[in-house]
Amino acid sequence: MKKNKLELVYLRAFICVIIIVTHLLTQITLENEQMSDSSLILQYYIRNIFIFGTPSFIILSQLLTTLNYESVTINYLFSRFKYIFIPYLLIGLFYSYSESLITASSFKKQFIENVVLGQWYGYFIIIIMQFFVLSYIIYKINFRLFNSKILLLLAFIVQQSYLHYFLNNDTFHQFMTHYYPLSENTMILGWIFYFFLGGYIGYNYEKILSFLEKYLIIVIMLTLGAYVLFIAVSGSDYWNVTSFTYTLTLYNSVMFFLLLGVCMHFKTMLLNTIKAISAFSFFIYLLHPIILDSLFAYTNIFEDNTIVFLAISLLMILGICIGVGMMLREFYIFRFVIGKQPYKLQFDQYQPNWN
């Protein structure tokens, strides 16, 4: 396995922050059901700017696999079961127990609905686990399939077709929800393009970095164009914001390239903080929604100043999650809760100049 590249450390940290911002903006919307139509529409388009976080994690996950491995064994799957799926189950157990207390419902009901069926924010892990299996199968067939532009195009067509019919065809929607047992968001056909895009980027990583270094302005223009296209084709349900839609596939994809291109230019900025966020990103993803409601009860006093609200909320969420994670890291057994990346975390030693 190759050494992690610094731009990917920044990228993973920024994607983690983007997901938190998405949830904070959603919290504002949900807590203000009486807002005016103009405010709702404005928030809808702002929230969609940041909605690329989940697709980006899927792209990044497969990018790292394809970049770092030219062959995989069964240990590839076993390692991800231990350090990704088991933490999913353990955090899910805690979440289900707390929800059973809040809603006065049975723990069994909460666990089955949320953790087993994926009807909670952690559904993303079910998607990732399916893609780990698919990645293993593709590696066993031919690693070079990740370099296929035809396969990438087919994946795009499959994803767009599936999402279009699922969201617009009642018969197809009812068929899928009836026969597919898990949460609708966990169906990998709705994410399959992001998986192959990540594989393609990882396979051609240096070429893509070279392109981004030379032509980042083109990516910026494509990003703006993709978002304008989304505005043109988006519907009128301004309450529902999701990345599980065909209208945002192009925007989500180009935003990943843009963020990667930007991260190439960071070398030392907040490096220790970025390393901590990146190392604990998986744990942050699973833990922060549990504490979000309680924190919002305090931070919503800054709601009229969105920038202040986001800054204070981010500081508190990251501080709590990383702080808890650092304490758990003292005990190796908690790798089954926080994952294995925090145990690889090493801070740079430097002496700040206060003069």
Curated annotation (Swiss-Prot):
It is found in: Cell membrane. The chain crosses the membrane at residues 13-30, 45-67, 74-96, 116-138, 145-167, 187-204, 211-233, 243-262, 269-291, 306-328. It is a multi-pass membrane protein. One of its GO terms (biological process) is enterobacterial common antigen biosynthetic process. The keyword Transmembrane applies. One of its GO terms (cellular component) is plasma membrane. Belongs to the acyltransferase 3 family. This is Probable poly-beta-1,6-N-acetyl-D-glucosamine export protein.
